[in-house]
Amino acid sequence: MKKIFLYILAVMTIGVGCRKTYNDTIQGQTPDQRVAAALAAYQKKLTAAPYGWIFIESTTGIAYNQGVSSTGPKIVLAYYMQFTDSGRVTMLSDFDPSMAATPKTSSYNIKQLTRPALIFDTYSYLHVPCDPDPNVSHSPFGFGYGWGTDFEFSFSDSVGAANLGDTINFIGNLNNARGKLIKATQAQQTAYLAGNVLQLFTGAGYLNNILQYFKRLSLGGVGYDIHLDPVDRVVTFTWVDASGNIQTAAVNYYITGTGIQFATPVVNGNQTITGIDNLTWDAGSSTLTVTSGSQTGTITGASTPIKADATAATRWWNYAARNGYFWASGSGFHVNGVDDAYGVTALTNSSGSFYYYAYWPNFNSGVDLFVPIMLQGNSLGLNAYGELGVPPPFITGDGRALFTSGGDVGLGGTFTPTPPGGPVAKSNATMFSSAGFYVVQNNEKSYDFVLATDAKTWISWFWPQ
């Protein structure tokens, strides 16, 4: 027995002597030390740029709120950022004119998550379009979503920090927004700090000084109708191609210190437009002068479209008639630079308070209806008076749509005569004007009607379902 015990003890001693200890160091560094060194290298990359960075963020059109998704318009935003080695970042933003004028400093951090991540961890300009309150973010997605932008990003290049170039790519950790840091030049930094983004906001605002709906850009001998949507940050170009067909390109835009840039270039044959710059307003001639690349162009008002879409009104009417519902306008007619020129949004009577202005194709068999929709309590209903229309609209040879009044009484006596001189009477007179409308389709569920007299009066329709 003693021999057996000594044998077992000897084997155990040999086993202990042969046991290998696992060493996870590489070049003398533990995993934690290697991670810390890598994160420090990322930070050094950001802070070593002497003139800062331009950060371009683009969304996918999907926003998430606690795992629930909502779809809406895409947006592209531009920021100027200067990082310090103390974890602070100073930025400017093109999201709002106030953010373009005043630099804001907040904190950032670089952490190891699934991948190394750049996290803006205190409220900054980057957080504003993410804000769940639509009163802050102006989000079209609804409460809780923001624009589908992010403020935590993973480095997405397939190289380590030491091999990153002057452009660094990111993916947002919540909404999968795409981010791109581009090392700024001294000229770009100077332009940002001199307030050029704010000046470009002002320059784009000069378009509102052109009272006509149709803004005609002449560039390199080519004419375009352009429409700037500052809410969804989209500019739409419409032109006529060599075959005489209408072509349209709607592109997101963003503003940097050196110009209004298009996320996607507008390509028309041999002409490519990547953005516009140097916007100068001449009040005497109501002309906005711009540059695009090496070319100088002008934007002026036009009383007619570059080419009328002769079938747009029919598409508009048929869509509502087929779906058994109405087109809605939130504020009625815009006239000579004034939104809600007739004061329809203040309309209040025994029917309730104004909610929409509606045009209802084929409301009853053989009759259309142009009428305010009123809110009373929690219910929507028709105003006590409106105007009947004779369907469908008549399309003239030059592409105008004419709407014919059927009077303001009928439908079994439901409606009473319209009070003269009020917002409904003025709206009726414009809607059924003998001048007719040029109809512009923005997308499947959005149209604008432009009064053909001088293109200074229009109404915008959206599909409310």
Task: Give short role names for the model-derived ranges.
Residues 169-171, 176-179, 187-188, 194-465:
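Ser/Thr/Gly/Pro-rich, low-complexity flexible regions
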Residues 77-83, 106-109, 148-157, 251-253, ...:
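Hydrophobic/aromatic beta-strand elements that line small-molecule binding cavities or substrate pockets
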Residues 2-8:
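Sec-dependent signal peptide recognition
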Residues 14-17:
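C-terminal motif of bacterial Sec signal peptides marking the signal peptidase cleavage site
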Residues 19-117, 189-203, 464-465:
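Acidic/polar, low-complexity intrinsically disordered N-terminal segments immediately downstream
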Residues 88-248:
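Long, acidic/polar, low-complexity amphipathic helices and coiled-coil-like
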